[in-house]
């Protein structure tokens, strides 16, 4: 697959299913790339896949696309040393790739089954931006006949919170959109906070839409539980200690980073994500189970080794 064909396939996957996470679309694209690859050696195939991941990250610079691609490559490569015949090995790699895709497609349902039990009848939930996993959790709570209401931040600069509010109104869930600046004001009315994550880092912290960190700080100050829901393919080998440690390639949109190469200054741009430290997080709900932030490093090691 040429670069243009790869990018077009990735974009078509995203357009075909709006509920699909960008990381899942990237993994589907990589699987298709693997099937079409004309390479004749394992080393060449691995190099081609690595380049394909880099190309996709240039289209969508989210943490999840990077970590999902790396985990996909790691998972399919585990059997590469067991077979001397290249065609046999490639066939096994494709089978493992399809297995990996099936596993991650079940992630949201597993998380929803774990997390919705923490939502009590009459709960007032605060959430941030648009998260497909959070939406799936709330759908499960609605299916369980629980009555609850949701406060959601509008989430500048793309107003993705309004998109989330619209999705919740279709479920007949009482929802109130609040200003990003009103998080401290509204926190005293909330019983718990549930947010998604673009990436879960090695120390148990998260990288998510800008504004998540201030919400976690407010929740901690007012002793409200702060829950994170995220699929395991978002676990990334990164160890930030503060906002400056988050790489620019994750902080900014791919288009913004390209414009910087033409001379534009990044200081004039607003970051799209921020880092929330593990000390502010109560629990993480993943398809691997319910984890404390301190348990994330153990699970991450299992995934990457």
UniProtKB/Swiss-Prot annotation:
Swiss-Prot/TrEMBL keywords: Acetylation, Cytoplasm, Initiation factor, Protein biosynthesis
Under Gene Ontology molecular function, one entry of this record is: translation initiation factor activity
Subcellular localization, as worded in the UniProt entry: Cytoplasm, Cytosol
GO cellular component terms, A-Z: cytoplasm; cytosol; eukaryotic translation initiation factor 2B complex; membrane; plasma membrane
For biological process, the GO terms are: cytoplasmic translational initiation; oligodendrocyte development; T cell receptor signaling pathway; translational initiation
| SUPFAM superfamilies, sorted | NagB/RpiA/CoA transferase-like (SSF100950)
Activity regulation remarks = Activated by the chemical integrated stress response (ISR) inhibitor ISRIB which stimulates guanine nucleotide exchange factor activity for both phosphorylated and unphosphorylated eIF2.
Membrane-spanning residues where? none
Sites of the modification N6-acetyllysine?
A: 35
Answer whether the UniProt record assigns the keyword Cytoplasm to this protein: yes
Q: Which InterPro entries match?
A: eIF2B_alpha/beta/delta (IPR051501), elF-2B_alpha_N (IPR042528), IF-2B-related (IPR000649), IF_2B-like_C (IPR042529), NagB/RpiA_transferase-like (IPR037171)
Q: Which family does it belong to?
A: Belongs to the eIF-2B alpha/beta/delta subunits family.
Task performed by this protein: Acts as a component of the translation initiation factor 2B (eIF2B) complex, which catalyzes the exchange of GDP for GTP on eukaryotic initiation factor 2 (eIF2) gamma subunit. Its guanine nucleotide exchange factor activity is repressed when bound to eIF2 complex phosphorylated on the alpha subunit, thereby limiting the amount of methionyl-initiator methionine tRNA available to the ribosome and consequently global translation is repressed.
Q: Which PANTHER family match?
A: TRANSLATION INITIATION FACTOR EIF-2B SUBUNIT ALPHA
Listed under subunit, the entry gives:
Component of the translation initiation factor 2B (eIF2B) complex which is a heterodecamer of two sets of five different subunits: alpha, beta, gamma, delta and epsilon. Subunits alpha, beta and delta comprise a regulatory subcomplex and subunits epsilon and gamma comprise a catalytic subcomplex. Within the complex, the hexameric regulatory complex resides at the center, with the two heterodimeric catalytic subcomplexes bound on opposite sides.
Stated name of the protein = Translation initiation factor eIF2B subunit alpha
Q: What is the lineage of its organism?
A: Eukaryota, Metazoa, Chordata, Craniata, Vertebrata
Q: Which gene encodes it?
A: Eif2b1
